[in-house]
Regions:
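Metal-cofactor-dependent catalytic cores
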Residues: 1-183
Length: 183
């Protein structure tokens, strides 16, 4: 399903009305390899590996100058209201692959760069990197979905989600909520 520009525009008020704190986790995903997805009931998050078994450690899209994976992209969080708009389990396009999906306001105003988030027993730090809805997002969910993410005034809303580094190892479960602990 590729949403129309009109559907995306009409959904914006609903997306922006998401909880500003204590957002429930609605989906967990691990990517063992490109275009592979598994949906466990919990994820282990570590500073050293991101999510053990996830492709971030071996095949990240961004690396440090020394070749190591950039820790600022260890974990991505996507708003569940956006996911519901662009993807359904019956779609032929794969799930976007964000490890955590939650009903939470991910905007820059709500979660400025550097904000610490308690996610289960783990702590994540919101990255300054903008998740712009890469080529895969456009191919899977349509050019309208990509254009919507980067439209004037939209980048600060972080409609494609946020990128985070693991600050403290821990575990996140489907029953957890995401809470702001600083920022």
């Amino acid at each position: 399903m590729t949403p129309t520009a009109d559907a995306l525009a009409k959904a914006l008020p609903h997306i922006l009305a998401a909880p500003r704190d204590a957002g429930p986790v609605t989906c967990l995903c691990i990517r063992p390899a490109r275009n592979q997805r598994a949906f466990p009931d919990h994820l282990t998050l570590t500073r050293a590996e991101g999510i053990p078994g996830d492709r971030w450690l071996t095949d990240p899209w961004l690396r440090l100058p020394d070749g190591r994976p950039d820790p600022r992209i260890q974990i991505s969080i996507l708003a569940s209201r956006v996911l519901d708009l662009v993807w359904h389990p019956t779609d032929t396009a794969p799930h976007p692959g964000d490890p955590i999906v939650a009903d939470l306001d991910l905007s820059e105003a709500n979660l400025p760069d550097g904000t610490l988030l308690a996610v289960g027993t783990a702590v994540l730090r919101v990255s300054s990197l903008f998740n712009d809805g890469c080529v895969k997002w456009k191919a899977r969910y349509g050019s309208g979905a990509k254009d919507w993410v980067v439209a004037p005034g939209h980048p600060t809303l972080r409609l494609r989600g946020i990128l985070c580094a693991v600050e403290r190892d821990g575990m996140v479960r489907m029953s957890d909520t995401i809470r702001k602990i600083s920022g």
